[in-house]
Amino acid sequence: MLLAHLAVQTLVLVIDGSVGGRGGVALMRHVVDKGRALPLAWVVRRGKKGQCPEALHIALVEQGQALIPPGARVVVLGEGEGDGTDCQHSRQEAGWFDVCRTGSHGTASWDGATLRLETVGWCITPGTLVEFPSAALTREAYGPLLLLCCGANG
């Protein structure tokens, strides 16, 4: 019921991993409303806090998809943990948009050239934003997507 009311605007979903019980980790998907993250779906596994397998992220997309009202516009905000190509593909198949911060250790291809993101980062000054429209990420060339590289101190 709440999601149906929130879905009149773009639904913003965020991902969070946290300790759950004794020796467990919960990977949670929240819907953001009025600056608060409201739990929507989660999967729990044994282990320590850290990166979860891509299959868990995909399971979370499938759980969330069943709860999202048909026709809702969804944007998922995530970190590098959910940037695997299978995970991105599952969100794309669900019709969701993706905003994901990823590490500079990867590769991208754009306009026929292969780029190491780390090298792009070295070449731009702090405060500069470089846009690569219709880029592809990883060796598998997942895309097209809009790749933004931001120069920062540190």
Where are these regions (language model features)?
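Aromatic- and Gly/Pro-rich donor/ligand-binding loops
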Residues: 14
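Single, function-defining residue in the core of a domain
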Residues: 6-11, 22-24, 33-154
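Histidine-anchored nucleotide/phosphate-binding helix
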Residues: 29
